[in-house]
Amino acid sequence: MTAGYEPCWLRYERKDQYSRLRFEEIVAKRTSPIFQAVVEELQKGLRSMMEIEPQVVQEVNETANSIWLGTLEDEEFERPLEGTLVHPEGYVIRSDVDDGPFRIYIIGKTDAGVLYGVFHFLRLLQMGENIAQLSIIEQPKNRLRMINHWDNMDGSIERGYAGRSIFFVDDQFVKQNQRIKDYARLLASVGINAISINNVNVHKTETKLITDHFLPDVAEVADIFRTYGIKTFLSINYASPIEIGGLPTADPLDPEVRRWWKETAKRIYQYIPDFGGFVVKADSEFRPGPFTYGRDHAEGANMLAEALAPFGGLVIWRCFVYNCQQDWRDRTTDRAKAAYDHFKPLDGQFRENVILQIKNGPMDFQVREPVSPLFGAMPKTNQMMEVQITQEYTGQQKHLCFLIPQWKEVLDFDTYAKGKGSEVKKVIDGSLFDYRYSGIAGVSNIGSDPNWTGHTLAQANLYGFGRLAWNPDLSAEEIANEWVVQTFGDDSQVVETISWMLLSSWRIYENYTSPLGVGWMVNPGHHYGPNVDGYEYSHWGTYHYADRDGIGVDRTVATGTGYTAQYFPENAAMYESLDTCPDELLLFFHHVPYTHRLHSGETVIQHIYNTHFEGVEQAKQLRKRWEQLKGKIDEKRYHDVLERLTIQVEHAKEWRDVINTYFYRKSGIDDQYGRKIYR
């Protein structure tokens, strides 16, 4: 940790199995900034893992063991690889040991492809794989693989649990260029190609990021990310024409407003020629937007898209739009329905450089909620998915909660938008409806902490997000194994133990928190710790409706809010009926008596008791398994993780006792096993 922070999974520890393999040359004829970064990374990895310093050459030595780096623009690679690579970021890795010297070829369709290919090769070395017979063709499934930062310019991070911003402090840029470079390396190593650096809730100072005052600083950050194949985006304030433009309105149909945004876009691209575009949170949670002027979201987004289009820029328009002034007495209004109701009628009305960014579920990154019905419901409108890597509702990086299994369930969910086989992953990779732009974004979990993510094991969520964004068909087991070996080494006990901990942790967290998909039950505002009625009588639309007889939200067509009708018929029917609704989502879709029997055979109330007692024991098991690794993990990381796991056990007990006591007092029904409940 020589730089004051960890290298995470790019540790490049020595690998004795390669001690006899001596690469003498790196053949690299290209000199672009990306290529220079590629060569530097390869040299760093070979130096650390194999203790060799191959020369970088442009002219080939026919007798030398070598690694060849190139693109399809290079004459010698164009013909043999013709038609192999379709995606501009794709690459080939091949070994050649047939005639004489040992060669590795890492060939990309573009420089970015070579970058990803080199990181893949270094991953193989870190994993201790046999590199003698490589024949790999890789192409990303998703075009846009993005990280969203919720960093504020005062240095704080909204929903951040890993220190302060690495970009901003005291309303200025930090100028931590080496750390930003190392962050870019981490992101590029898992295939991330886009980043927005400021919070979607754009405050007064951040509104000025699109002005001459801050654009030189934005350009400096963009230069660093560009070197690693990452485009820079900014979150913008929809009211900017008023707040910094001196106009009396931000009406998207006003000619002066449109002119102002066109001039602003032109200015940005003078500083950053490959600027990615804007991320927009509008008409949501008190943020300004087109509704103020009687316009819809298509009119609002298209105005920005028109300004960016001449430069190839994108508008990423968030669909997190709902009534945050709901009357809790009103049982007909349903926050879960809002995104679909707002956006579905606008299908086909958005410009082609607009992408709708849709949260994985209809509510707000809960430990369990159904997949948003908006996925697949707009065949004429670009869509991408938003997940939350930062653990706002899943333990805030004090608790271990590996989110890859959750995201896998979402990606593999069949929408039935074009019949069976219409999974969410096919919607967001653009293949189902031939979207021009699509992809996936994750809200970052990093900050200035030495381990980047607060909880060392939370690094696995950032790593896993990138790997899933590149290839949604990777399994959670594969991703966990890759991360553990690269981060902690290949000792079999270490790999087996930490992989088990990761893969078990989401269900464990779910067990001791809110039951059966009902969500929330957290302290208002900061969202940490149990408070069953914390939001029950608020204006946020996040209710569980527990009374003396039962619990849950009736979202059926027959007797409830009608939310189930937003799904395609196969899923609508599944969720509408108690007979087919999955247990884990029962209380999201139905209000049932505490004595209702789940498909598991347990009653709802007994399930609540059982899972909360079991969850605490499972949290203890996480800590116990980690303690068995003492001496196999360096002291710093061992104690850091142990401290977090101890916190998790204590907080799991609090969750257990609050939830079980609350529902005992509501229902008056005893735990059939007579365990301790505070009456």
UniProtKB/Swiss-Prot annotation:
Enzyme class: hydrolase
EC number(s) reported in the record: 3.2.1.131
Residues marked Participates in a stacking interactions with the sugar rings of 4-O-MeGlcA (site): 150, 540
pH-dependence annotation: Optimum pH is 5.5-6. It retains about 40% of its activity at pH 4.5 and 7.5.
UniProt-annotated catalytic positions: 285 (proton donor), 364 (proton acceptor), 392 (proton acceptor)
UniProt effect for mutating residue 510 to A: Strong decrease in the glucosiduronase activity
GO MF term (any one): xylan alpha-1,2-glucuronosidase activity
Protein residues bound to beta-D-glucuronate: 201
Keywords: Carbohydrate metabolism, Glycosidase, Hydrolase, Polysaccharide degradation, Xylan degradation
Effect of residue 285 to N: Relatively low glucosiduronase activity, but shows binding to the substrate
Outcome following mutation: residue 392 to C: Loss of glucosiduronase activity
GO BP, sorted A to Z: glucuronoxylan catabolic process
Gene Ontology CC: one annotated term: extracellular region
Regulation: The metal cations Ni(2+), K(+) and Zn(2+) show some inhibition of the activity, and Ag(+), Hg(2+) and Cu(2+) shows very significant inhibition even at relatively low ion concentrations.
Binding positions for substrate per the UniProt entry: 158-159, 281, 318, 335, 359, 386, 510, 540
Enzymatic reactions: Hydrolysis of (1->2)-alpha-D-(4-O-methyl)glucuronosyl links in the main chain of hardwood xylans
Temperature dependence: Optimum temperature is 65 degrees Celsius. The enzyme is stable up to 70 degrees Celsius and lost 70% of its activity at 75 degrees Celsius.
Mutation effect (residue 386 to Q): 14-fold decrease in the glucosiduronase activity
Mutagenesis or variant effect for residue 364 to A: Loss of glucosiduronase activity
Entry similarity comment: Belongs to the glycosyl hydrolase 67 family.
Protein name in UniProt: Xylan alpha-(1->2)-glucuronosidase
UniProt organism field: Geobacillus stearothermophilus (Bacillus stearothermophilus)
Gene label: aguA
